[in-house]
């Protein structure tokens, strides 16, 4: 079932401007291309709110199903980068949610008796 993974984070206040720029380059140039290779990953995009690329950052990953997240964690390329991805986050403010796409199939499954 098509799933949207949403991760909302703020970067740590202790990061310098240079570290923030390097982190964004890492996400764009290294992490996203590797995550996109995991079967079932449809898209991975990053969005920033009004926090100047430091706060109110949202990662949106469109996946074939919620199991793709577990495949990310099991994938050697992605798992090798997880610590670096998380290292810049203020984990006190980080949140994540999974959302199912409302499809005719989902409606039929939920309405059948």
Q: Model-predicted segments: where are they?
A:
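An amphipathic, aromatic/His-enriched active-site/gating alpha helix that lines ligand/cofactor pockets
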Residues: 26-42, 60-100, 113
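Short coil/turn motifs at secondary-structure junctions
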Residues: 12-14, 51, 64-66
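Short, conserved charged micro-motifs
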Residues: 15-22, 68-72
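Active-site-flanking beta-strand signature of metal-NTP-handling nucleotidyl enzymes
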Residues: 2-11
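Basic/polar N-terminal segments that are highly enriched at the extreme N-terminus
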Residues: 1, 111-113
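A short beta-turn/loop motif at secondary-structure boundaries
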Residues: 47-54
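Histidine-centered divalent-metal-coordination microenvironment in nucleic-acid enzymes
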Residues: 56-58
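Acidic, low-complexity intrinsically disordered segments
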Residues: 101-107
């Amino acid at each position: 079932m098509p799933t949207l993974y949403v991760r909302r984070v703020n970067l740590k206040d202790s990061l310098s401007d240079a570290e923030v720029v390097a982190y964004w380059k890492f996400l764009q140039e290294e992490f996203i291309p590797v995550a996109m290779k995991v079967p079932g990953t449809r898209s991975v995009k990053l969005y920033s709110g009004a926090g100047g690329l430091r706060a109110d950052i949202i990662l949106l990953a469109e996946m074939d199903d919620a199991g793709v997240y577990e495949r990310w964690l099991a994938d050697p390329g992605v798992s090798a980068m997880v610590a670096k991805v998380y290292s810049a986050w203020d984990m006190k403010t980080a949140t994540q949610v999974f959302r199912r796409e409302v499809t005719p199939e989902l409606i039929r499954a939920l309405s059948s008796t």
